């Protein structure tokens, strides 16, 4: 039986896109898409090898944003709009890392979902 050949990654020539930063209390996920929502690159603190409570640090979010920006720039990305979702500690540092990586940030939008008194929240932690 013939060995299945892996598809070669096609270089998409896209100038502008959207960086979605999903910052939870436990992890930070950075996904860079084109304006239609098709994924170009993604990275997360966990995917970079951070484990446990180190995933939720601002430094881990910074590294995730740098990794996603680097692979998105290989597709020709130059400008990016940022949408931030979630209450995590990596929100600010991920945005700064995208700008420092050479992407021009044109807009920052907070799209954190706010319930209109929907489901009951989890009980308070007693440490």
UniProtKB/Swiss-Prot annotation:
SUPFAM superfamilies: Translational machinery components. PROSITE patterns: RIBOSOMAL_S11. One of its GO terms (biological process) is translation. GO terms for molecular function: rRNA binding; structural constituent of ribosome. Keywords: Ribonucleoprotein, Ribosomal protein, RNA-binding, rRNA-binding. One of its GO terms (cellular component) is ribonucleoprotein complex. Signal peptide: none annotated. Part of the 30S ribosomal subunit. Interacts with proteins S7 and S18. Binds to IF-3. Belongs to the universal ribosomal protein uS11 family. Located on the platform of the 30S subunit, it bridges several disparate RNA helices of the 16S rRNA. Forms part of the Shine-Dalgarno cleft in the 70S ribosome. This is Small ribosomal subunit protein uS11. It comes from Streptococcus pyogenes serotype M1. The gene is rpsK.
